[in-house]
């Protein structure tokens, strides 16, 4: 719905504060009641947002989560890398379920296209790395961003000039085929096939293409609220994450301005989503890790329990997630980088029944105490976590809707997290459905 206040609407950015998979999709869906539009501003179809609505599970990879609400307009900003094939596959899935999508989806003409050679390079590189692989989803996200930075990328708007598109595509195919065949030892891609398939998408895309930046400004100026939906998480950010074990885009709150074409002064509130514990998919350092399905040395019983009770499997890849205790020192880093206004704690109910709960509040690194996640993967890998222990609770927190109804031990745990990171917890998610939520401060109403 529209903002009730006269004048410019309020804007909320929802970002993950960990390594992704924090439960952003449910919270975005919950907040959509208060927003006219929902905006994706980075990433591609490598991130799956899982929604449970009326007991039905829906996984969105590219289209903003607001599409589940009939009155909401969804935007894909210029910072997104767009696979037309993946887009229309997702549209068809949603429309087959009875949702109207294409008349409510607006796509930036400046969004970078993911084309088949990006996917081929992504997969060939991972195969060549062998045991040293980064853990990419193999969907062409990284290579597409590489082309964007190198200024050779093809964008959505290029599809509508077939001659220009064909010329640019030929140059790109020649370049990438050299990499595929001469360096990666993979098969070449076919220029004509890519050209024909790409141009076939043009008339289907065109009705949805817009000057997203200008539309967002106009919608906001008319007094309507907007929400900016981040993908992945801060610790996977290409600049601020555990590099090189990161994604290929900026997934911090600041990227919402550049990736959607809005002024940073228009971002009123930053909501940081964090689980009550930590998970990570793929390779990379993880100081508070307890369980890794692929590592026999990481089979702690509590970690296994977190994975099973929390159903920790990637929504896009299906890969088992690594699990560990909540790392408040890493969370503090994310809070500072993003300028987080308030936190939303998700999956608190997964901790129900644990006798003891540990919270990482810092590290021992090179003989010194460190209270915030250091920069660089080597330093993070060398960190020995420093824990505080809390008594668990036997009462169920599942579906609890008020703060006072939480077990006292759970409230003590959450309050300590607030103290360590220095900002309030404004929301607590106690189950997958949108109404299984404790609201302490409303992101659209915080002064």
Swiss-Prot record:
Q: Which InterPro entries match?
A: Adenylosuccin_syn_GTP-bd, Adenylosuccin_syn_Lys_AS, Adenylosuccinate_synth_dom1, Adenylosuccinate_synth_dom2, Adenylosuccinate_synth_dom3, Adenylosuccinate_synthetase, P-loop_NTPase
UniProt-listed PANTHER family: ADENYLOSUCCINATE SYNTHETASE
- Residue positions annotated to bind IMP are 21-24, 46-49, 137, 151, 232, 247, 319
Q: What is this protein called?
A: Adenylosuccinate synthetase
List cellular component terms (GO).
cytoplasm
Assembly and interaction partners = Homodimer.
Q: What is its main location?
A: cytoplasm
The residues listed in the UniProt record as binding GTP, with positions renumbered to this chain, are: 20-26, 48-50, 321, 347-349, 429-431
So what does this one do?
A: Plays an important role in the de novo pathway of purine nucleotide biosynthesis. Catalyzes the first committed step in the biosynthesis of AMP from IMP.
User: Keyword Protease on this protein?
Assistant: no
Q: Which cofactor does it need?
A: Mg(2+)
Q: Which GO terms describe its molecular function?
A: adenylosuccinate synthase activity; GTP binding; magnesium ion binding
* Record-listed E.C. numbers: 6.3.4.4
The record lists Mg(2+) as bound by: 21, 48
An example GO BP is: IMP metabolic process
Q: Which family does it belong to?
A: Belongs to the adenylosuccinate synthetase family.
Q: Does the keyword Phosphoprotein apply?
A: no
The UniProt catalytic activity note for this protein reads: IMP + L-aspartate + GTP = N(6)-(1,2-dicarboxyethyl)-AMP + GDP + phosphate + 2 H(+)
Q: Which residues bind substrate?
A: 315-321
């Amino acid at each position: 719905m529209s903002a009730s206040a006269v004048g410019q609407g309020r804007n909320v950015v929802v970002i993950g504060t960990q390594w992704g998979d924090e439960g952003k999709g449910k919270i975005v869906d919950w907040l959509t009641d208060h927003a006219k539009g929902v905006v994706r501003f980075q990433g591609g179809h490598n991130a799956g947002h899982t929604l449970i609505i009326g007991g039905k599970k829906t996984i969105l990879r590219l289209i903003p989560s607001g599409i589940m609400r009939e009155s909401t307009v969804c935007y894909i900003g210029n910072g997104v890398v767009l696979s037309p094939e993946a887009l229309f596959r997702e549209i068809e899935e949603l429309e087959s379920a009875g949702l109207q999508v294409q008349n409510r989806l607006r796509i930036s003409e400046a969004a970078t296209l993911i084309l088949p050679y990006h996917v081929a390079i992504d997969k060939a590189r991972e195969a060549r790395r062998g045991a040293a692989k980064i853990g990419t989803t193999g969907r062409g996200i990284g290579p597409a961003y590489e082309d964007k930075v190198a200024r050779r990328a093809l964008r959505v708007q290029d599809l509508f000039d077939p001659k220009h598109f064909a010329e640019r595509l030929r140059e790109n195919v020649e370049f990438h085929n050299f990499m595929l065949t001469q360096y990666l030892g993979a098969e070449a891609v076919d220029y004509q096939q890519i050209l024909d398939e790409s141009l076939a998408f043009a008339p289907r895309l065109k009705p949805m293409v817009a000057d997203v930046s200008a539309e967002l400004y106009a919608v906001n100026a008319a007094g309507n609220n907007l929400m900016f939906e981040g993908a992945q998480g801060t610790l996977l950010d290409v600049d601020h994450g555990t590099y090189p074990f990161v994604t290929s885009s900026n997934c911090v709150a600041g990227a919402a301005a550049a990736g959607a074409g809005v002024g940073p002064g228009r971002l009123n509130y930053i909501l940081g989503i964090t689980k009550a514990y930590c998970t990570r998919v793929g390779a990379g350092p993880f100081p508070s890790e307890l369980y890794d399905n692929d590592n026999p040395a990481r089979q702690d019983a509590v970690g296994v329990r977190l994975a099973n009770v929390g159903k920790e499997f990637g929504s896009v890849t299906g890969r088992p997630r690594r699990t560990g205790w909540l790392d408040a020192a890493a969370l503090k880093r994310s809070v500072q980088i993003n300028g987080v206004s308030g936190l939303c704690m998700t999956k608190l109910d997964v901790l129900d029944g644990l006798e003891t709960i540990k919270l990482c509040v810092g590290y021992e690194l090179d003989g010194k105490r460190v209270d915030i996640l250091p920069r660089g993967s080597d330093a993070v890998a060398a960190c020995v976590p420093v824990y505080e222990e809390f008594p668990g609770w036997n009462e169920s927190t599942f579906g609890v809707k008020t703060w006072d109804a939480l077990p006292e031990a759970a409230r003590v745990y959450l309050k300590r997290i607030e103290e360590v990171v220095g900002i309030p917890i404004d929301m607590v998610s106690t189950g997958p459905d949108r109404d299984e939520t404790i609201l302490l401060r409303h992101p659209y109403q915080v002064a």
